Amino acid sequence: MRTSVIPNRLTPTLTTHPSRRRNDHITTRTSSLKCHLSPSSGDNNDSFNSSLLKTISTTVAVSSAAASAFFLTGSLHSPFPNFSGLNAAAGGGAGGGGGGSSSSGGGGGGWFNGDEGSFWSRILSPARAIADEPKSEDWDSHELPADITVLLGRLSGFKKYKISDILFFDRNKKSKVETQDSFLDMVSLKPGGVYTKAQLQKELESLATCGMFEKVDMEGKTNADGSLGLTISFAESMWERADRFRCINVGLMGQSKPVEMDPDMSEKEKIEFFRRQEREYKRRISSARPCLLPTSVHEEIKDMLAEQGRVSARLLQKIRDRVQSWYHEEGYACAQVVNFGNLNTREVVCEVVEGDITKLSIQYLDKLGNVVEGNTEGPVVQRELPKQLLPGHTFNIEAGKQALRNINSLALFSNIEVNPRPDEMNEGSIIVEIKLKELEQKSAEVSTEWSIVPGRGGRPTLASLQPGGTITFEHRNLQGLNRSLTGSVTTSNFLNPQDDLAFKMEYAHPYLDGVDNPRNRTLRVSCFNSRKLSPVFTGGPGVDEVPSIWVDRAGVKANITENFSRQSKFTYGLVMEEIITRDESNHICSNGQRVLPNGAISADGPPTTLSGTGIDRMAFLQANITRDNTRFVNGTIVGSRNMFQVDQGLGVGSNFPFFNRHQLTVTKFLQLMSVEEGAGKSPPPVLVLHGHYGGCVGDLPSYDAFTLGGPYSVRGYNMGEIGAARNILELAAEIRIPIKGTHVYAFAEHGTDLGSSKDVKGNPTVVYRRMGQGSSYGAGMKLGLVRAEYAVDHNSGTGAVFFRFGERF
């Protein structure tokens, strides 16, 4: 299965028509909203499958009262981070602008761009080049003496000039601009580029009208090789000192239409025009919603204003970067600063489009990617979405990740995409698209395994090869409501399956209270048959092999699982089963067997069933509650996992069994040091602390006794080698140290029967000479799915190497 949040870059650019300037005041026409989807290659294997990468490019329309705004346009590349089978990505936008200032407009002052030449578009898109830049690398020599200054107007209109370098000179500071200054990125001319006089003049005009500068000039200096060095000298625009800062969300506000000023207006009419613009802007921002920016960032920006003095272009750029960095760090990947207003009024108003969600769209795709009618009911998917992803909320990348995890947990889809895109009907807002590819409803699977049984003389023959395995079938998503019917059949010998045939058939019915009910309960009904080797009848150290006892269980089970949260669930139900104990010859046996000193086998061992006949039937209630707060840090699990289970006999069945069997398991995964999280980063060392208690009050058949020893109990011992008891306690500690690609670990464990072995019928612990308690220690290494470890048990004082599948905890 592949699930992904499509990595999007929401790349907004403001496109305006040529502006007109009168008395340092600029008017622009509104821009249009366009969204373009284009794929970009990307591949991420952070312990999960590769994800499909896409890019969203969008033009965000923003406009305000023309005389009192500072427009920001541009692009910010901030992709969603990927993770483990559930890749989440998003992009953010940035702002830019241009404009001018007005001394007669009161609250006026702003930057606007003309002819797509805004300063912020340039500074945020450094790879941009002049549209009609010639592709040819041929260029002409200036044919002038070296080291002389040439004004732009003195260049020939018929030549193509090579620009060797570009220098920015700040007239206010009377110094060259440092290489790290963002002003160097705003010009579209590039060192080594070839340009005509018309292109250079167009660049100068674009810089002069962007509102960034009070004055800007361009001149060249001749080089001996025929190329030109370009110097751009400028005086930065400045506004009045400000001591107040306000941030507003304009994402869902209707964009105002700017009114062009008549160039033939009298001075009195111009003043009145500016005042109307100011009143309109104040009315507009008074109805705006406050942005999500916290008070701490507000205070930080106020300190920036106090330290700076007069408001400058560089200061507004720093404010924009600080505001947007907070949004993107908090996961609001579609948020962007689009406007600064109220300049020259001692208050800077920052307008932000935060990415308000106006619509949720769920689409089902076929194998070719075409939109089709899905089998899954819409509410099944919708109930898995966090509320932060619903209309009326602000899009957040973490909500997108959570949606992926939740939808993936349904196990109904082969591919999942969460894709935020601009809403063309509501400027500045977001539509969340969820695209799903459904799995086939019916599936069947066969897994095989071969075993070799020694023949005569101990040598295997071709006839001794036994083909075994499991056949599984599933019909999922019945009626589109995620109901399923699954079945499996397992045997170690398909040629003679009656010896150990095991099966399970289960029907799952989620949303027991209705798909629209927030209560999350699932009903499961199953019938089963299984056979397992009983660890109760196992010899202790130095005891010859004890004849095996097999326990067959067949019955039905019905339970309800209620998920309180993603971390906590409660399961309760009824179990009715028949238990039959058999010896190695597959005969029903009522007692365990033991080897006598003369080598003979005696059948007078501990009783195997409660009834004494080898066959028990019983019914009991079962309930367990689990709380799992674990998570992965660079592939290593940390957190805690706790489980409590109770089985309550009802007095129904053989000998009217009435009992209470209970278990408590507590496991802590303690992170020993902080590490940087991300793909390819090293995992932290972890200390694992584990405790398990089991106890029983009332009737206790031997097959339900608690056993000690084995790969999932006390390591270093065989299954049940320490003892079988009515009450047990296990304690374990393990420290995991990461190494390249895996981890090594050391452990120590102890298990005790708390003196309760004698309370089990027939006392199998004493009969088979087991100690009733034991400790072990050792070390190991994780090799893929295999644990390779060396363990020493204290009861015998010997050690051995073990290879185990799966995890101990």
UniProtKB/Swiss-Prot annotation:
Composition bias type Polar residues, residue spans: 1-17
Subcellular localization(s) per the UniProt record: Plastid, Chloroplast outer membrane
Effect of D132N: Reduction of processed protein by more than 50%
Parts of the chain on the Cytoplasmic side: 153-160, 235-247, 366-410, 437-442, 474-500, 562-569, 694-705, 784-797
Chloroplast intermembrane topological segments: 132-143, 170-225, 255-357, 419-427, 453-464, 510-553, 578-684, 715-776, 806-809
The organelle targeting sequence, given as a residue range: 1-35, 36-131
Record key words, sorted: Chloroplast, Membrane, Plastid, Plastid outer membrane, Protein transport, Transit peptide, Transmembrane, Transmembrane beta strand, Transport
Swiss-Prot/TrEMBL GO biological process terms: chloroplast organization; intracellular protein transport; protein import into chloroplast stroma
An annotated Gene Ontology molecular function: protein-transporting ATPase activity
Chain segments annotated as coiled-coil in the UniProt record: none
UniProt keyword Transmembrane present: yes
Task performed by this protein: Mediates the insertion of proteins targeted to the outer membrane of chloroplasts. Required for the import of protein precursors into chloroplasts. Forms the voltage-dependent preprotein translocation channels (hydrophilic beta barrel) of the TOC complex in the chloroplastic outer membrane. The narrowest inner diameter of this channel is approximately 14 Angstroms.
NCBIfam families: 3a0901s03IAP75 (TIGR00992)
Domain notes: Transmembrane regions consist mainly of membrane-spanning sided beta-sheets, which are not predicted by sequence analysis tools.
Name listed for the protein in its UniProt record: Protein TOC75, chloroplastic
